[in-house]
A protein has these predicted regions:
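Short, small-residue-biased leader/transition segments that mark boundaries at the very start
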Residues: 1-5
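A motif-centric signal for short, conserved binding hotspots located
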Residues: 6-167
């Protein structure tokens, strides 16, 4: 796998780069990493600072940890175990995503704008040698998509017969 990582990417540029073995921030917009059931693109964590473009920044989840008083004890189910452990907070800073973990704005592939989802990461690199994310930023809730879609999902995507062999 180490040799594979050193090869040139098949499409675009790498979204994850290391400097002295530690993840570094990107200066280019993340590529499309997938498509949601509603047909909208899912990008990596880096996008334009403003919905109209500008410099590239790591986009932020609008969710924060909010442990409820009636949840099971954290000694049994650790903090952030349940979806209910998170609350979405409205924010006027355009680097924060909406409750669906997306926003409307321009991207390299959609210069006129598109609603898109973004993968979200913690803002700091993990420094714990026992952690599988050591020297990397951990994924951050809701990771890819929030509670709802930004557009109407295609019903075909929910059928059991819809798989890669059918396309």
């Amino acid at each position: 796998l180490g040799d594979v990582y050193k090869r040139q990417p098949l499409y675009g540029s790498r979204d994850l780069t290391l400097s002295s073995g530690v993840e570094e921030n990107k200066t280019q917009h993340s590529p499309i990493i997938g498509w949601a059931y509603d047909g909208l693109p899912i990008y990596g964590p880096y996008g334009y600072e403003k919905s109209t473009g500008g410099s590239v920044t790591q986009l932020n989840s609008g969710y924060s940890v909010d442990l409820k008083t009636n949840r099971p004890p954290t000694s049994v189910f650790p903090q952030e175990f349940f979806i209910e452990d998170f609350t979405w907070n409205s924010n006027t800073d355009e680097s924060y995503l909406d409750e669906n973990n997306g926003r409307y704005g321009v991207t390299p592939e959609y210069p006129n704008g598109v609603y898109a989802y973004f993968a979200t990461l913690e803002s700091t690199v993990t420094s714990d040698s026992s952690d599988p994310f050591n020297n990397f930023k951990k994924p951050k809730f809701p990771y890819l998509l929030g509670e709802n879609f930004g557009a109407q999902p295609n019903e075909f995507n929910f059928l059991s017969k819809s798989n890669q062999d059918e396309i």
